[in-house]
Amino acid sequence: MIHFIIALVLFGHGVAHVSGFIASVSKKDIGFHIEKPWIFSNNITLQSPLGKFFGILWLAATAGYVLAAIVLIASNDWWTTLLIPAATVSLLVIIPFWNTVPPGAKFGAFFDLFVIIVFTTSLKEYLSELV
């Protein structure tokens, strides 16, 4: 039962990344401050060419989290192999656009950090016993 709950959380977190892609390619208001620059330069926004590249990376994080959830439900042990890169990419796309992303994405960054810490330390074995 616990693996279904974890898979649902991972799936939901993954799907939430679609908003980063949408914000990079459309003017639709979905909570992002698309006019604000990223933290390194005032010339780069989420809708600049580099910002659009980051939007594609948001989709990669979506794919990683969603696939990890599916593999977990299928009871395969290698779901964490997908999860760690997905969390890393997610964190790497949120941090540069910290001024741009909505509060939910900032919370998601802390979730990504939690995932990276748990699944790259001995805590991984403890969680593996639960699922």
Predicted regions and their residues:
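Membrane-interface extramembranous regions
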Residues: 1-131
